C-alpha cells in the first residue's frame, strides 16, 4: 500500500440493535496520517461506528476496510464471512483503541500493563517490550510512575497509560472514544497534549470527542453525525465556523454557548 492511500474505508455501513438502526449507511474515508474527529449528540452512532472499525461490533451490511483489508471478515465470492477469533485478534494488532474508562488491569503495574499485549499477542521478548514501554511512558509524561498501580494514579494519568499501552502494539491506526469524557476538567489538558503529539508524529487517528476547540486545533477533517448518518463532513473551518446543515448549526449553537 502506498503512503497516499486511505487507511480506513467505510462504504454504506449499517448496524442495528434489534429494531433500532444505529448506523444508516455510513460512508467515510480516512487518509494516511489524517486526523478525523467525529462530533454529534449522544446516540448519533459515533462510538458504534468506531467500535465497528476494529470489529468490536459486527456490521450488518456494507464494507469496512483498514489498509485495504476487511476487518473481521473475508470475502468469498460476493459474500463476507466472519473470520475465526484468532485471525480477528491478529487484525486488531494494527488498530489501537483508547476507551473512555481506561480499562487498565488493576493488579498490574503501569509497566506491566504496557508490556502485556506486546508479549502475549506479538511474542516480543520481555526485555525488548520493557525497553519500548519505558520510552512510551516517557513520551506520555509518566516515566516516574512505572511501578505504580492504576489505583495510585489520577484519571488523566490512567488514560495516558492507556494511550501508551495502545501505542506499544505499534498500530497503524488509533481510535479514541471520547478519551477525556470521564476526566475531571483540570486533567483533560495533559491527555489532549499526548494526542496532539501523536498527531504531530503522523499517526492516523479517528477521534470521537465533545472537545470542539480540540477538534478545531487537531483535526484534518471533522464529521458531524446525527441519528446514524453523516450529516456534514469537511475541514474544521468549514464545519465548525461555517456549517451548512441546520442540524450541524443547531448542535454547535448549543455546545459553543
Where in the sequence are the language-model features?
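Short coil-to-helix segment of the ABC ATPase nucleotide-binding domain corresponding to the Q-loop/switch region
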Residues: 108-116
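ABC ATPase "signature
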Residues: 233-234
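Conserved ABC transporter NBD signature motif
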Residues: 62-76
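Conserved ABC ATPase signature
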Residues: 149-153, 157
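A short, proline-enriched helix->beta-strand linker immediately N-terminal to the Walker B motif
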Residues: 168-172
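Catalytic Walker B motif of ABC-type/P-loop ATPase nucleotide-binding domains
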Residues: 174-177
Amino acid at each position: 500500500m502506498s503512503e497516499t492511500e486511505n487507511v480506513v474505508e467505510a462504504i454504506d455501513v449499517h448496524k442495528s440493535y434489534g429494531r433500532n438502526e444505529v448506523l444508516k449507511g455510513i460512508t467515510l474515508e480516512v487518509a494516511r496520517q489524517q486526523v478525523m474527529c467525529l462530533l454529534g449528540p449522544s446516540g448519533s452512532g459515533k462510538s458504534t461506528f468506531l467500535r465497528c472499525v476494529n470489529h468490536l461490533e459486527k456490521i450488518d451490511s456494507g464494507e469496512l476496510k483498514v489498509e485495504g483489508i476487511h476487518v473481521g471478515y473475508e470475502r468469498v465470492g460476493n459474500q463476507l464471512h466472519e473470520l475465526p477469533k484468532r485471525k480477528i485478534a491478529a487484525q486488531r494488532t494494527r488498530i489501537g483503541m483508547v476507551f473512555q474508562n481506561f480499562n487498565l488491569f488493576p493488579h498490574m503495574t503501569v509497566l506491566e500493563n504496557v508490556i502485556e499485549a506486546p508479549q502475549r499477542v506479538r511474542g516480543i521478548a520481555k526485555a525488548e517490550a520493557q525497553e519500548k514501554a519505558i520510552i512510551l511512558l516517557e513520551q506520555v509524561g509518566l516515566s516516574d510512575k512505572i511501578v505504580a498501580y492504576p489505583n495510585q494514579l489520577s484519571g488523566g494519568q490512567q488514560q495516558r497509560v492507556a494511550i501508551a499501552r495502545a501505542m506499544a502494539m505499534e498500530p497503524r491506526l488509533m481510535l479514541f472514544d471520547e478519551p477525556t469524557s470521564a476526566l475531571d476538567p483540570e486533567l483533560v489538558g495533559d491527555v489532549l497534549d499526548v494526542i496532539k503529539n501523536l498527531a504531530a508524529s503522523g499517526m492516523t487517528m479517528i477521534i470521537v470527542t465533545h472537545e470542539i476547540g480540540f477538534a478545531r486545533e487537531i483535526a484534518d477533517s471533522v464529521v458531524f453525525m446525527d441519528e446514524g448518518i453523516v450529516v456534514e463532513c469537511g475541514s474544521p473551518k468549514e464545519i465548525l465556523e461555517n456549517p451548512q446543515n441546520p442540524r450541524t448549526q443547531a448542535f454547535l449553537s448549543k455546545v459553543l454557548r
